[in-house]
């Protein structure tokens, strides 16, 4: 609700900001229907398919921006949308708002989020049962808060299931497993130099110079 509230208060349409205009496509390419995700950071390993929060957000974006990627993702996950309680009141108010639920025919197999340093690739975005998906991260943002020391790391899934994924589990920010494994580079599909991983700091940044 925040962008709508701020739009009302400030008399500026926050939904026209590039972040909201591109969030639907980013969400669809990161988390295909009925599939694990190829994203990064705390908790990326937990769900087997997009959750109600993600689908509720996709529905919101589709209604407010007309994004076909967000509309397609929301339509493919109707049960999760039904279970979403956070945006339920919004959907009641916006009940008559319709949106496109068809994945664009010209949907690329590859998308590069240059501002955050992530690349997402799909062999068949529209068909999870045939899709091979790869996510790669080398970001100008280092390790801090909900990010981990996984520069130059990748996630690989096939038919919605993990092939190569980061390991471990998140309990709390300061437990031994979180600090020495889950957040450490050794838990991710990246490179250690003489057994040494990347630093736990926002200065431990990376970069993707080109992608094709």
Predicted regions and their residues:
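Catalytic and substrate-binding regions of extracellular carbohydrate-active enzymes
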Residues: 73-212
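Alpha-helix capping and helix-loop boundary segments enriched in small/acidic/polar residues
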Residues: 11-18, 49, 61, 179
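Secondary-structure capping and boundary motifs in well-ordered enzyme cores
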Residues: 16-23, 53, 82, 183
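Extended ligand-binding clefts on enzyme/binding-domain cores
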Residues: 36, 40-91
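Aromatic-lined, polymer-binding surfaces characteristic
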Residues: 1-39, 43-44
């Amino acid at each position: 609700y925040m962008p709508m509230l701020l739009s009302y208060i400030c008399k500026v349409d926050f939904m026209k900001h590039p972040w909201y205009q591109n969030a639907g496509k980013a969400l669809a390419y990161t988390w295909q229907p009925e599939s694990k995700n190829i994203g990064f950071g705390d908790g990326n390993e937990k769900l087997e398919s997009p959750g109600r929060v993600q689908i509720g957000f996709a529905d919101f974006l589709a209604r407010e921006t007309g994004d076909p990627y967000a509309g397609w993702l929301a339509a493919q996950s109707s049960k999760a949308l039904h279970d979403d309680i956070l945006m339920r009141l919004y959907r009641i108010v916006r009940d008559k708002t319709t949106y496109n639920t068809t994945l664009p025919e010209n949907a690329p197999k590859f998308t590069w989020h240059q501002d955050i340093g992530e690349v997402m690739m799909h062999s068949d975005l529209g068909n999870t049962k045939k899709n091979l998906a790869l996510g790669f991260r080398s970001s100008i943002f280092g390790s801090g808060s909900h990010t981990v020391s996984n520069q130059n790391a990748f996630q690989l899934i096939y038919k919605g299931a993990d092939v190569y994924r980061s390991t471990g589990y998140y309990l709390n920010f300061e437990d031994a497993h979180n600090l020495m494994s889950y957040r450490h580079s050794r838990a991710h599909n990246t490179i250690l130099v003489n057994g040494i991983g990347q630093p736990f700091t926002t200065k431990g940044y990376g970069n993707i110079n080109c992608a094709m």
